[in-house]
Each structure stands twice: as C-alpha cells, then as structure tokens.
Swiss-Prot record:
GO cellular component, one term: nucleus
Family: Belongs to the engrailed homeobox family.
PROSITE patterns: HOMEOBOX_1, HOMEOBOX_2
Gene: en
GO biological process: neuron differentiation
GO MF annotation list: DNA-binding transcription factor activity, RNA polymerase II-specific; RNA polymerase II cis-regulatory region sequence-specific DNA binding
UniProt KW keywords: Developmental protein, DNA-binding, Homeobox, Nucleus
Protein name, as recorded: Segmentation polarity homeobox protein engrailed
Record field: compositional bias (Basic residues): 21-30
Length: 93
C-alpha cells in the first residue's frame, strides 16, 4: 500500500478520487429508450447532399435552410451531415 500523495499526480496510474478519463460518462437525465433514432437518409437526399458537398464543403445559413426545406429535413440534420462528411474526409487523409 502506498501513501496517498503517491496517487496525487496527473500522470499516476494509481487510484484517484475522480473519474477515470477513459470512462464513458452517461447522461443521467436521458434513458436509452429516449435517444433519438439515427436519421436514415433516402437515396435522393444523399445524392443531393453529396452534390452540394462537392460544390461547397461549407454551407451558409441561408443555403442550409433552403436545403432543409427542399429535402424535408431539419437544419440540424443538414449541418451534422456536413460536419460528419468533413470529419470523415479529414480522418481519411
């Protein structure tokens, strides 16, 4: 057994009073069944999003609103799709 001060450094592998940085933090206010289901884009929606992405990797607010209206999606779905697409390309390179 080691004295308490041995475990007080941020580089220690020993036990600590805080949470492990690798542990997943669960949101206590949401139950798993309340999680919003993953959006399943139609082929037409995907083709349109991909086309828009080839034209411009970043959308203006106005263009995002237009796309959302034209595709029957909400703006957040459009925004997240573009963010994920940029992240995927960055990760691959």
């Amino acid at each position: 057994l080691w004295p308490a001060w041995v475990y007080c450094t941020r580089y220690s592998d020993g036990p600590s009073s805080g949470r492990s940085p690798r542990s997943r933090r669960l949101k206590r206010n949401k139950k798993p069944e309340e999680k919003r289901p993953r959006t399943a884009f139609s082929g037409e929606q995907l083709a349109r999003l991909k086309h828009e992405f080839t034209e411009n990797r970043y959308l203006t607010e106005r263009r995002r609103q237009e796309l959302a209206r034209e595709l029957g999606l909400n703006e957040a779905q459009i925004k997240i799709w573009f963010q994920n697409k940029r992240a995927k390309i960055k990760k691959a390179s």
